[in-house]
C-alpha cells in the first residue's frame, strides 16, 4: 500500500484543530513501521516550529510494563514538548484543549548539560540533571476511541497533550526517585498510585533510554531541556470540572483543574 507521510501528518494536525479524532494509522503504515511513525511525528514538529512554536524538551511514553504488554511492544517511545503546552502549578486548564484527555503523574527533569552520546550512562544522565520536579502529563489521542497501537501513538507525538509543572524544584542529590511513592486524587478521591520503580524500573532509566535514542538520531538532549520521564501509576480519564492533585513522596506535589473553555489561563 502506498501512502503519503505528509498527508497522514496533516490528518493528525487537522484532528487536533477540529476536535474530531481519526481512524488508526496502523492499517495504513503497518503495525511495525516505527520509522514511518517517527517520520510523521517529525513532520508535524517541523510544521509547528515553522509556525512559531518553540520546542522545550521531550517526553518518554510507554514506560509502564502493563502498557507495553497491552500494545505488544518491548520499548518506550518519545514525543516532543512545546513551550505552549506548559502550565504552572494549580493551573486552570481548558478542558477542551486536549482531545480525549487522560492524566498521569510523573517526574520531570530539567537538564544543565548536553547529552550528545548514543551510549550515555546512568551516571552521565544523573550528573546532567539540574532540577527534579513533580509533574502532571495530560495525554490525549487524535486516534478515535484511543484505539492505538505503537505506530499510532508514535505518529501522534507519543499521545502528548500538555503538562503541568509543580514544585518544589530540587537538586537530584539525596532524592529516592526509585522508591518514591505517588498518590493522585481526582476531586479528593484516590484514583492512581504507584512508585518510581514502575517507570522502567527507575525514572532515570527512561531518561537514559531517551538520551541514547535521541543522540542516535542526531537530535540529542540539550542543556535547558525539560524531560518528562513517564507515568508512575495508571493514567486516569479527565472530565470537565475535575481537579487533580498528585503527591510524590520526597519530590513534591502538583495540581490542576480542568475548566470549561474560556475559563483557563496558561502559564507557559
From Swiss-Prot:
Metabolic or biological pathway, per its Swiss-Prot or TrEMBL entry: Aromatic compound metabolism; 3-phenylpropanoate degradation
A Gene Ontology term for the protein's cellular component: cytoplasm
Keywords on record: Aromatic hydrocarbons catabolism, Lyase
Enzyme class (EC, first level): lyase
Protein name: 2-keto-4-pentenoate hydratase
Family: Belongs to the hydratase/decarboxylase family. MhpD subfamily.
Reactions catalysed: (S)-4-hydroxy-2-oxopentanoate = (2Z)-2-hydroxypenta-2,4-dienoate + H2O
Stored InterPro entries: Fumarylacetoacetase-like_C (IPR011234), Fumarylacetoacetase_C_sf (IPR036663), Hydratase-Decarb/MhpD_sf (IPR050772), Keto_pentenoate-hydratase (IPR023793)
Functional note: Catalyzes the conversion of 2-hydroxypentadienoic acid (enolic form of 2-oxopent-4-enoate) to 4-hydroxy-2-ketopentanoic acid.
Cofactor (UniProt): a divalent metal cation
Molecular function via GO: 2-oxopent-4-enoate hydratase activity; manganese ion binding
GO terms of biological process kind: 3-phenylpropionate catabolic process
EC annotation from Swiss-Prot or TrEMBL: 4.2.1.80
